[in-house]
């Protein structure tokens, strides 16, 4: 499944993740709210701007969602969507990326440099609260800034999109398909 989960390019000014479901790329709407998602795939960078989304819903009321969906011709995954209603106690899996920055000191200010890369993070989650199309999860790993837009899976299908949280608190997710 992790081959279908992507992070925003290092060339981007902001962070976020998303996943490919069939020919659709799905992320959190707030990830593309301030600027495009730069998707590095197949040796090229695709620019996904919110104006090009086939579905863009950034409404945090219970019947809203925090989801952006883009059609990506030429790319395909075997992932499917799970349209079940979230219920407290449901067990989920998470896959996201964490951006790692490492500063390397040199002898002079001119020889100092930074190295950046992404590290994949996989874990489990349990739904603890449901409010319309949104749900909270306790996770087995600490998800950092930049994990927004990552998928949460139930039985190998994309069940929702991570959209927020603070360290030590439950993670907030949005259903991909609104009621």
Language-model region placement:
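C-terminal cap/linker of serine protease catalytic domains
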Residues: 100, 158-179
């Amino acid at each position: 499944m992790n081959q279908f989960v992507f992070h925003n390019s290092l060339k981007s000014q902001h962070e976020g993740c998303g996943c490919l479901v069939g020919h659709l790329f799905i992320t959190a709407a707030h990830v593309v709210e301030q600027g495009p998602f730069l998707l590095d795939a197949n040796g090229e960078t695709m620019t996904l701007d919110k104006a090009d989304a086939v579905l863009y819903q950034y409404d945090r009321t219970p019947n809203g969602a925090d989801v952006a969906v883009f059609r990506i011709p030429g790319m395909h995954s075997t992932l499917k969507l799970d349209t079940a209603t979230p219920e407290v106690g449901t067990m989920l899996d998470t896959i996201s990326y964490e951006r790692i920055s490492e500063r390397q000191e040199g002898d002079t200010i001119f020889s100092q440099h930074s190295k950046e890369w992404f590290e994949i993070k996989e874990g489990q989650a349990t739904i603890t609260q449901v409010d319309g199309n949104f749900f909270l999860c306790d996770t087995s790993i600490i998800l950092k800034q930049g994990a927004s837009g990552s998928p949460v899976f139930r039985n190998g299908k994309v069940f929702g999109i991570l959209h927020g949280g603070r360290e030590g608190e439950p993670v907030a997710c949005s259903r991909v398909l609104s009621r």
